[in-house]
Regions:
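Cytosolic juxtamembrane N-terminal segment immediately preceding the first transmembrane helix
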Residues: 1-58
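Structural signature of the two symmetry-related core transmembrane helices
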Residues: 110-125, 353-369
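Residue-level signature of mid-helix packing/kink "hotspots" within the transmembrane helices
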Residues: 61, 89-97, 149, 183-184, ...
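Helix-loop-helix hairpin linking two adjacent transmembrane segments in secondary transporters
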Residues: 175-227
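Symmetry-related core transmembrane helices of the 12-TM Major Facilitator Superfamily/SLC fold
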Residues: 202-220, 459-478
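Conserved MFS/SLC helix-loop-helix module at the cytosolic interface between two early adjacent transmembrane helices
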Residues: 94-134
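Cytoplasmic helix-loop-helix junction between adjacent transmembrane helices
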Residues: 140-180
């Protein structure tokens, strides 16, 4: 009962502190204050957020699922093809700090709803773009990226406000499972719709319907105001090793600071900086794999004589389906394994989280390198090593976010997530698909046109991903040197 009383005052004051009150002055329900089984309502909110995250990443990876069809339809080189995902990611990362600023100060439910409505509408509109309007198609992908940024920046902070200690790790793991699940479903949905209809445009007409459902669920099931926890409740170890704070939430700790002050504080946080650079390496590798791997596998099969070259618009989509299935399966297993490993090892080592991330990055890089080397001779071995590479990459998703949530004070967490998105995409997957395509073009230009060099150009381009993954592991190792001190600072 004391906890209910402690949480009541910040919930009532949230509208004053962050501008969360509705314009007409109506009072929305508060999750933490609800006496009708608040735990059940919290899980309903998480279910809605997970569904939205699923749609978010399906939209993200629909285009890579039909990449070969798009190349034939618009007549694109590898470089121009990679530009599609680069534009999406650039707009995504540039919008993220804006939504981080808004999410720390204004009503998060309204921002989420506007983002879902915007990206779903643009996706539907892009499905009607004709062959002569490639630039409009590129622009539409950028606009979808802006809408997606609102969701990825704000949704994790809502989950962090609803749960604490061990539960937060579990719930965040469930939320982040929908990154690989959504990504894999994006490949499979795109390939399946293109194959069944004979027209890739239909692949872009499914998720807007799902987005409309997500928006309806958001309106009906997510409270208008969700109480923001203070540092005493949130900025502590997820493992529960640090004892529950005795002081009551102090509304004065939520005093406003400028965005520049928030950024200045975050830049001095070594754990945040190093883990963000580690995640940047993750983003570089996953971005390149996500866009180019189905096409790389197709070219490997062509060189081996397993499939014929695609000379028409509706191309073989089996690699997108298989790679999508691998992404879903390894993503679920990896995130669950990462969360469980973190939960167990934190009891023995306070530096367990960054060490888990570093180890998984090193192993993933090795598996990816082996997959590239055997691709020309054994396609089955290639699939196996790609699966292991993706499995160990997926281990990090929830763990990296967990690190951020306990080394950054709560009132700066939306900004921290936004900055992490900005850095990881600016130096990671914003450029990696385009870079891989440009290197592939350069290799092909220096050799005579052939199916063999079409494959080798992509193979040589991908090698850079293995080395970037090793650098990512190094940054996570650096994080382990600072994480204990920064965690204590966040608690204070």
């Amino acid at each position: 009962e004391n906890e209910d009383t402690d949480l009541l005052l910040p919930a009532l004051l949230e509208g004053q502190n962050y501008g969360a009150a509705a314009a007409d002055g109506t009072q929305g329900p508060s999750v933490s204050v609800s006496r009708n089984n608040p735990a059940k309502r919290n899980y309903l909110v998480v279910a809605v957020l997970c569904f939205g995250n699923l749609i978010n990443f399906i939209d993200w990876f629909i285009v890579p699922g039909i990449l070969l069809d798009l190349q034939k339809y618009f007549g694109l080189s590898d470089g121009k093809t990679g530009l599609l995902q680069t534009v999406f990611t650039l707009c995504y990362m540039l919008a993220a700090p804006i939504f981080g600023y808004l999410g720390d100060r204004y009503n998060r439910k309204i921002i989420l709803g506007a983002g879902i409505f915007f990206w779903s509408g643009v996706t539907l509109g892009s499905s009607f773009i004709t062959q002569s309007h490639y630039r409009i198609f590129v622009l539409s992908r950028g606009l979808v990226g802006i809408g997606s940024a609102s969701y990825s920046t704000i949704a994790p902070t809502i989950i962090a406000d609803l749960f604490e200690e061990g539960k937060r790790t579990t719930v965040l793991s469930i939320f982040y499972i929908f990154i690989p699940v959504g990504s894999g479903c994006g490949y499979m949905l795109a390939a399946g719709m293109a194959k069944s209809t004979g027209d890739w445009h239909w692949a872009l007409r499914v998720t807007p319907c799902m987005g409309a459902l997500a928006l309806l669920l958001l309106i009906l099931l997510v409270p208008h105001r969700i109480q923001r926890r203070t540092a005493a409740h949130r900025a502590r170890s997820i493992s529960g090793m640090i004892r529950r704070a005795d002081e009551k939430p102090d509304v004065h700790t939520a005093a406003k600071t400028t965005w520049c002050q928030d950024v200045g504080s975050l830049v001095k946080n070594c754990s945040f900086v190093c883990s963000s650079l580690g995640q940047t390496a993750m983003a570089f590798v996953t971005g390149a794999l996500g866009v180019w791997m189905p096409l790389f596998l197709y070219r490997a099969q062509v060189v081996q004589g397993i499939v014929p070259p695609c000379l028409q618009e509706s191309c073989n989509s089996s690699n997108s389906l298989i790679f999508g299935g691998i992404t879903v399966g390894t993503g679920i297993l990896g995130i669950i394994a990462g969360a469980e490993a973190a939960r167990r090892l934190r009891k023995k080592n306070n530096k367990a989280d960054p060490l888990i991330c570093a180890t998984s990055m090193f192993i993933s890089s090795l598996c990816l390198y082996i997959a590239l080397m055997v691709a020309q001779t054994n396609i089955l071995s290639t699939f196996i090593f790609i699966a292991f590479g993706e499995l160990f990459l997926s281990v990090n998703w929830a763990v990296v976010t967990d690190i951020l949530l306990y080394v950054v004070t709560p009132r700066r967490q939306s900004t921290a997530i936004a900055l992490q998105i900005l850095v990881s995409h600016l130096l990671g997957d914003a450029g990696s698909p385009y870079l891989i395509g440009v290197i592939s073009n350069a290799v092909q230009a220096r050799n005579s046109p052939s199916l063999q060099w079409s494959f080798r150009s992509m193979q040589y381009s991908f090698v850079i991903c293995a080395f970037v993954g090793v650098f990512g592991g190094g940054f996570f190792l650096l994080t382990s040197f600072y994480i204990e001190e920064d965690r204590k600072e966040a608690q204070r």
